[in-house]
A protein has these predicted regions:
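N-terminal membrane-targeting/pre-transmembrane regions
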Residues: 1-45, 93-95, 101-175
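Canonical hydrophobic alpha-helical transmembrane segment
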Residues: 27, 51-67
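Transmembrane-cytosolic junction motif
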Residues: 63-84, 90, 94
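N-terminal recruitment modules of adaptor/scaffold proteins
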Residues: 81, 86-88, 125-212, 216, ...
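Short acidic, Gly/Pro-enriched loop/turn segments at secondary-structure junctions
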Residues: 93, 109-120, 215, 223-235
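A short macromolecule-binding patch
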Residues: 99, 238-245
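Structured surface patches comprising rigid loops and adjacent beta-strands/short helices at the edges
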Residues: 101-108, 218-221, 247
Length: 278
């Protein structure tokens, strides 16, 4: 039996659900009052028609809000535990528990602070053959859930990845081409998007399809909302750049490189750690 630990929080439909229900109830009440008003008072025929039209329009608007609520309801909801995340799929009536240590790839799209996180998206999966679990802003406290998932990946996989680097191994990171199109597929529930490129990080080299970057040359890392992730040499020249949204598990990638830059891992001085990457 999997040890879930204590449940920490629930992440169901966000509070916008109650706002929509309250607004719909108010519209229905106002609409009903407008329809009943002509029956309770002596009003000119022209005014009666106006009131009936206004009442019908108000009720129709309330129905529109209820329909909007249906489409805004998240397919996946979550329970956050000490050792993982419990995922509820309301569409297929299934549930499963994903331990933090099993989370492989994490995708994050940052919509910008100007929108207050409304367009932020996070998705994670246990493996390349597993479906994506999406966390949109219509999930209650989605920002907290996403931050915990990323933080746990850093705590669980970070030490293992660093140990692999120290032992001369490589850590792969998948990237996505056409990230806007792939994000749209996630929004539509088509969660089988496949990364198209793999970066390989070792203690001595960052291997990409555009060329290799020696770790020894990297002196600084920038993670900017607009400019993305950029690696610089000692003269301030850009050695490598990639959009944050295009790199899966970008926070782990940043954490590993920052550790290697700040601690200057002497892998290139150790013959046992300079063998070619696998």
């Amino acid at each position: 039996m999997i040890d879930k630990g204590q449940m920490l929080s629930r992440h169901d439909f966000s509070k916008v659900n109650w706002g929509i229900l309250a607004a719909a109830a108010l519209l229905f009440s106002v609409g009903a009052a407008l329809l009943v008003l002509p029956l309770l008072s002596s009003i000119d025929e022209s005014q009666v028609i106006t009131l009936l039209q206004a009442g019908a329009g108000t009720i129709l608007l309330g129905c529109t809000l209820l329909a909007l609520r249906h489409y805004l309801r998240p397919t996946l909801t979550y329970r956050l535990y000490e050792h993982g995340v419990r995922v509820f799929d309301s569409h297929h009536h299934k549930e499963r528990f994903i331990p933090f240590e099993k989370i492989g790839d994490i995708y994050r799209f940052r919509g910008g602070q100007a929108f207050g996180g409304l367009f932020d998206v996070t998705a994670f999966r246990a493996g390349a053959d597993q479906p994506w679990c999406t966390v949109f802003s219509n999930v209650a406290h989605s920002w907290r859930l996403a931050d915990v998932i990323v933080d746990q990946q850093l705590q669980q996989r970070g030490p293992l990845a660093l140990n692999a680097l120290y032992q001369g191994g490589t850590v792969p990171f998948h990237t996505i081409e056409g990230d806007a199109r792939w994000l749209w597929q996630l929004l539509l529930g088509k969660q089988q998007g496949t990364p198209t490129e793999t970066l390989r990080l070792s203690a001595t080299l960052l291997t990409t399809e555009r060329g290799n970057v020696p770790i020894e040359q990297i002196r600084a890392l920038e993670n900017h909302p607009q400019r993305g992730i950029r690696l610089f040499d000692g003269q301030g020249h850009v050695l490598f750049a990639i959009n944050y949204d295009s790199l899966l598990s970008a926070d782990l990638f940043i954490a590993l490189l920052e550790h290697m830059i700040h601690n200057r891992i002497p892998a290139y001085h150790n013959p046992a750690m300079t063998r070619p990457s696998v």
